[in-house]
Amino acid sequence: MARTTSAVARHRKKKKYLRAARGYFGGRSKLWRVAKNAVERGWQYSYRDRKQRKRQFRRLWITRINAAVREQDTELNYSRFMNGLKRAGVEVNRKVLADLAVTDSTAFGELVQRAKASLS
C-alpha cells in the first residue's frame, strides 16, 4: 500500500487562512503561523461582537428613547414611559420607538401623551 500525504488538504487549509488574512498588515497576511493566529483571533472577536452588537443597539435605543421622552415631558423618564405604554396597551418595540423619536417627533409626542394619561 502506498504512503499517502496530506499535501492537498494542507494546501487548501493554508490557502483558506491566507485568503482570510488578506488586508492584514505585514506578516499577518503572509506568514502562515502569524496569519493563522491573526485570523483565528479575528474569528473570536467577530463571534463575540455579534453577541455584543445586540446589547449595544438595545442600549442605544433606550438612551434615545429616554432623551426624547425627557425632551417632550420633564416629569417622565424612560421606565415610567415604558410602563405607561404597557398600561395603555401600546405594543411597540424599542427599535421602532427610537426610530420614531429621531425621525417623527410629533408621533412620538402622541405616544408620550398616551403613556402619561395611562399612568394618571
Language-model segments: which ranges?
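Short coil/turn segments at secondary-structure boundaries
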Residues: 52-56, 72-73, 99
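Intrinsically disordered, Lys/Arg-rich N-terminal extensions and targeting peptides
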Residues: 1-61, 67, 106-120
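Short, electropositive, low-hydrophobicity segments enriched in small/polar residues
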Residues: 27-31, 88, 93
